[in-house]
Amino acid sequence: MEQATLGGGCFWCLEAVYQMVEGIESVVSGYAAGQTKNPDYRSVCSGTTGHAETVQITFDSKVISYFEILEIFWISHDPTTLNRQGNDVGIQYRSIIPYHSPEQKKQAEQSIQKAGEHFSDPIVTQVEILKEFYPAEDYHQNYFRTNPKQAYCHYVIKPKIDKYLKTGFKVKKEGS
């Protein structure tokens, strides 16, 4: 199994999309790319820690490649808006790829170039080495699955899931 860490707005959105993808073993919402140790949601939302809301994805590279994970990333958020996704505004919502290896860095940079062909505005996604990943509090994990009737889930997360379903990427079978 390999890992990928990505930030593209609220971690609930990326978590919900990647949990559907065949070859993804687990998705953990958390914080990365900041300056303080052991951040919590309140401190991250204050903007003082420098962390981004991210997801750490454990995947089977025999089923899905890192490059394919990045392709899903580009359709799951707007990488052209700085420190913002829709109404979610702040440094914690920035688009970022904290890479785990030099090979991931290379693929991230190639993926940005390829994705840039599909956006009219420049991509502002940061690419930097993952120094530390801190899992978010338990109530943030599996958010869409445990709160499907919550308004944010209905109006923000569900459209991103629907967009993913239209791509033709493989979706996990029910119960897997």
Swiss-Prot record:
Coiled-coil regions listed: none
Keywords: Oxidoreductase
Active-site residues per Swiss-Prot or TrEMBL entry: C10
GO molecular function: L-methionine:thioredoxin-disulfide S-oxidoreductase activity; peptide-methionine (S)-S-oxide reductase activity
Enzyme class: oxidoreductase
GO BP terms: protein modification process
Family to which this protein belongs: Belongs to the MsrA Met sulfoxide reductase family.
General function of this protein: Has an important function as a repair enzyme for proteins that have been inactivated by oxidation. Catalyzes the reversible oxidation-reduction of methionine sulfoxide in proteins to methionine.
Catalytic activity annotation: L-methionyl-[protein] + [thioredoxin]-disulfide + H2O = L-methionyl-(S)-S-oxide-[protein] + [thioredoxin]-dithiol; [thioredoxin]-disulfide + L-methionine + H2O = L-methionine (S)-S-oxide + [thioredoxin]-dithiol
Domain of life: Bacteria
InterPro entries: Met_Sox_Rdtase_MsrA_dom, Met_Sox_Rdtase_MsrA_sf
E.C. code: 1.8.4.11
Gene3D superfamilies (alphabetical): Peptide methionine sulphoxide reductase MsrA
Protein name (record): Peptide methionine sulfoxide reductase MsrA
Species in which this protein is naturally found: Leptospira borgpetersenii serovar Hardjo-bovis (strain L550)
